[in-house]
Amino acid sequence: MSMKGRESGMPDEAYWASFFETEIAIDKLIGTAVLGNVIEFGCGYGSFTVPTARRTTGRVIALDIEPEMVDCVRQKAVTFDLPNVQADVRDFVAHGTGVDSGSQAHAMIFNLLHLEQPISLLREAYRTLQEGGVLSVIHWRSDIPTPRGPSLEIRPTPEQCRAWIADAGFHSIASVDLQDCCPFHFGLLARR
């Protein structure tokens, strides 16, 4: 059984890209360099995959349940000469990521914590991260109307996400101000 999340359909790529200044967001969430591998839960069009791959010394493992999204990311990896991108079709909600425990320096969970089992997803991210590894989370804000995103009723608040992140074992949870680059989103960072 597929675990495609509720209200997870993607809009047109150009419209989707209009919601984010991805380079600025990735600078704030990832930094200018990641030493090691990055895992991306739900890569979509690769909006965040490409800038992340440019900043990491290791691989970016970009996972999505939708084959057409993975194909899009693979094509971008070729177009932008990013051989460190490994895009795979994977139902990580139902089956986990399939990567070794402690093998990742950074885990990205962007626009996914409205799914039915957010703590399970966060625990899988925790499992993949090396000691001291970083989790970055962004999600659609629930306190304002937005032009896209899941219904307001199922969007988690930053406070809910912080509690879930802590329940999954993370510490040093901090807010990241994304208003200049992703005005419809909030950001959080945490450490394993």
Language-model region placement:
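Conserved class I S-adenosyl-L-methionine
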Residues: S136-Q160
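Class I SAM-dependent methyltransferase SAM/SAH-binding core
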Residues: I39, Y45-S47, P51-H95
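Conserved alpha-helix/loop element of class I SAM-dependent methyltransferases that forms part
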Residues: A17-G36
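A short acidic, Gly/Pro-enriched loop at the edge of an enzyme's catalytic core
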Residues: T97-H106
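Core SAM-dependent methyltransferase catalytic element
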Residues: D177-R192
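A short SAM/SAH-binding and catalytic strip from SAM-dependent methyltransferases
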Residues: A105-P118
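A short glycine-rich, Lys/Arg-flanked "PGG" loop and its adjoining helix->strand segment in the class I
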Residues: S120-V134
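Class I SAM-dependent methyltransferase Rossmann-like catalytic core
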Residues: S2-F20
